């Protein structure tokens, strides 16, 4: 037994062998670390038989950079000594330094003799810098008026600034209900005896509503060219239902306009926009319509239907004879039917005389037809030159407005069959209720901004803004605030409405001596006839105003109680 125990003790167990191996590795690592720290030897003496030592030595050595490049073989710039003497070497760094502006040398401070009148001279001859000159020019361009002009273009955004707090947009239950009731019933809470709330927040909420038809929540019906409308398909059954609803709504809205129960409304199609206005609005004694933009095909279709129109913004300056012939032809469209039937247009007589003269000279009939077709193409090109521009605006006035209404009601081109919103009727927009209409609401957002070290309260409104919105809000703020300002963004397609109205007011048909009296009388009768149209009396007075600065394109409006309105 003793011999077996001695033999067993000579054998090494596997766990003991592993412990010895690990202990040996730790000793080797410690020795290598000490040798590296003390720099006793420049390089490790590696035993090739020990794999662990080889791995440690490989890790301890510094890895060679594979991208290193020898500086001995580097390329050097060859410099010709003769050229070096003639001109200096221009490098990228020297160009950069040379082109970079440097700070000018400080001016010398020189003390001058005391002048007792120097301070007084500063007040007599003030120095004006470039910013002051720009402010002076802007102040000169701004027009100060006691009233705010009306802008007949549709707005897409409005922002109001005021140093004092603006009306609250977080409404209470009574304020929301009172504003909604006042708008639907066309009431002025301040002038009628009622229990409705008359706070500023309620009145401001009343200004944010308008009526629209049709209303499809998943589509953007103004502007009708919005990106969200791409790929929208309307079925045949839906198209028929929308057309029937729109027909009934358009008829009812136009009847309200003729009865002066609606002051104005917009018809927004894919390719044109129409503004219908009641009698007395914009200085016109009868109901009328403004169409922008128009095309040669549309004007030709109106002529074929016997609808007379005029183009108030059309430029009269013509550069050639073809434009003159077109101007003469366009002016004949505004003549009465009797004048057109009694005598042919002068342009047509001239063309007949020219043809007879060419035939008398023996010109071939084929050549004559070629000349006639060339002349007709030139006339068409001259007539199409102003298509899709503000100058192509059409004015349909008086009894012709009824014919134009029937034309839009039956025209197939009013409802687009292809493209965006195919099959969706034009959008009808009105400040008062009409059949099949849906009430819409502008959502204001308030915030506090800091400009030039001064805190301002701001209200930002995004959406479709009708022309009567700004006069209503301005009337409210002018009563309760000392000063405020507003910036507006207009829809480009409707700028021609304000331009045409302004030009029609500046060129009256009556003589200058009788114009002022008739304008004042027309304004009074217009306000009286539109007293039941559903708008506030101050707003009715602004849209019926015919004096100076009655209409204008508004981008920025400032108000101070002592000076009035300044706008540009």
UniProtKB/Swiss-Prot annotation:
GO terms for cellular component: nucleus. InterPro entries: Donson. Disruption phenotype: Flies display a distinct thin-eggshell phenotype. It comes from the Eukaryota. One of its GO terms (biological process) is cell division. Residues 28-48, 311-355 are annotated as: Disordered. Keywords: Cell cycle, Cell division, Developmental protein, Nucleus. It is found in: Nucleus. Residues 315-335 have a biased composition (Polar residues). Expression peaks during late G1 and S phase (at protein level). The keyword Flavoprotein does not apply. PANTHER family: DOWNSTREAM NEIGHBOR OF SON, PROTEIN DOWNSTREAM NEIGHBOR OF SON. Essential for DNA amplification in the ovary and required for cell proliferation during development. Belongs to the DONSON family. This is Protein downstream neighbor of son homolog. It comes from Drosophila melanogaster (Fruit fly). The lineage of its organism: Eukaryota, Metazoa, Ecdysozoa, Arthropoda, Hexapoda.
